From Swiss-Prot:
Catalytic reactions of this protein: L-histidinol phosphate + 2-oxoglutarate = 3-(imidazol-4-yl)-2-oxopropyl phosphate + L-glutamate
Organism of origin: Leuconostoc citreum (strain KM20)
Named cofactor requirement(s): pyridoxal 5'-phosphate
Pathway membership, UniProt: Amino-acid biosynthesis; L-histidine biosynthesis; L-histidine from 5-phospho-alpha-D-ribose 1-diphosphate: step 7/9
Protein family: Belongs to the class-II pyridoxal-phosphate-dependent aminotransferase family. Histidinol-phosphate aminotransferase subfamily.
EC number: 2.6.1.9
N6-(pyridoxal phosphate)lysine found at: K222
CDD domains: AAT_like
Protein known as: Histidinol-phosphate aminotransferase
Keywords assigned by UniProt, alphabetized: Amino-acid biosynthesis, Aminotransferase, Histidine biosynthesis, Pyridoxal phosphate, Transferase
EC top class, as a word: transferase
């Protein structure tokens, strides 16, 4: 067993809804800890999956996910032969680190950010350098991240918008940073929450063709409401594309996943309606936080990062009323996914006590 992972803690999943109801005696539980969508997927998804013939069950699925590959390539205007699919973006994060990192390497990440980047570096016995974000705005410190690059740096991770801060960096700032990096350093831009961004200059996905050391990740778990189906994809150039295709598990997306994803992508009007609801609720919640003098960062996602003093105490108070939020990331900050109107108003009433 690798010494670096011998004492690694397992992922702590959300408490089952039934357990929360039984423990706290509540009739309604709002799952707002994993940034899932309270609105669910497009109404086209369920019927599409149910229409899949039982005849396919005895055969392996399309190992190239051809229908999904074509749908994503058309929607995002990228080369279909630059797409690698995975069971959520999580699988692609794991594969990228496995393919790129060696025990002598280091990776650079903002702090705070999504914990899986450092976790998978640890599994590969690489070192992670964490660079604090701007404490006032939450923006990534690109200068400090560049200064941290050395001869052993092989990857830089950038969640954009960042998780858990929700803060968004512009395409121009990202490309300026990328252009300074050595070609030997791969910049992975994780755009899991891109669909919620309402600013221009929002994505670098179509810049991959111009930069061999740029990779972009996406997921259908958030705005598309398909967290249970586990669908993610990455856009990258050769030779990384071919190596990733060789290393990933064959048939890693089944027919139901592929069919549901294609149906979801075909319904952009539904996606737009979800994003509009999230934006409206985000703006109202931020107005509440400003009015009551909570520190938070301006978000371009479906969640908020809020300083509350004692995260565990506030998290327990919310959970006791049926609101599951994430209080495990920082001792003083909580991450709250935006729920329905009534859920958000209910959480605000509780936050007034702190």
């Amino acid at each position: 067993m690798k010494e670096t992972i011998k004492n690694m803690a397992a992922y702590e999943a959300e408490l089952p809804v039934a357990e929360v109801k039984a423990t706290y005696g509540v009739s309604h539980v709002a799952r707002l800890s994993a940034n899932e969508s309270p609105y669910g997927p497009s109404p086209k998804v369920g019927p599409a999956i149910r229409d899949v013939s039982d005849d396919v069950l005895g055969f392996y699925p399309d190992g190239q996910a051809t229908a999904l590959r074509q749908a994503v390539a058309k929607l995002e205007q990228v080369n279909p032969d630059s797409l690698v699919f995975g069971a959520g973006a999580d699988e692609l994060i794991e594969l990228l680190t496995r393919v790129i990192l060696t025990p002598n390497d280091n990776v650079i990440v903002p702090n705070p950010t999504f914990g899986e980047y450092a976790m998978h570096a640890q599994i590969e016995q690489a070192t992670t350098k964490s660079i604090p974000v701007n404490q006032d705005t939450g923006h990534v410190d690109f200068d400090a991240m560049f200064d941290a690059v050395d001869e052993h740096t092989t990857m830089v991770w950038l969640a954009n918008p960042n998780n858990p801060t929700g803060v968004f960096e512009t395409r121009s700032d990202i490309l300026s940073f990328l252009q300074k990096l050595p070609q030997s350093v791969v910049l992975v831009v994780d755009e899991a929450y891109y669909d919620f961004v309402d600013q221009i200059d929002a994505t670098v996905i179509r810049d991959v063709k111009d930069y061999p050391n740029l990779v972009v990740l996406r997921t259908l778990s958030k705005a598309y409401g398909l967290a249970n189906l586990r669908i993610g994809y990455g856009v990258m150039q050769e030779p990384l594309y071919q190596v990733m295709q060789a290393v990933r598990l064959p048939y890693n997306l089944n027919t139901y996943q592929i069919t549901g994803a294609v149906a979801a992508l075909s319904d952009q009007l539904y996606l737009q309606s979800v994003v509009a609801k999230v934006k409206s609720e985000r703006e109202k919640f931020e107005q509440f936080l400003t009015k009551h003098q909570f520190k938070y960062y301006q978000s371009q996602t479906n969640f908020l990062w809020i300083k509350v003093g004692d995260a565990k105490r506030v998290g327990e108070a919310l959970l006791s009323e049926g609101y599951q939020i994430n209080d495990r990331l920082n001792a003083e900050w909580i991450r709250i996914a935006l729920g329905t109107v009534s859920d958000n108003e209910g959480m605000q009433r509780i936050l007034l006590n702190f």
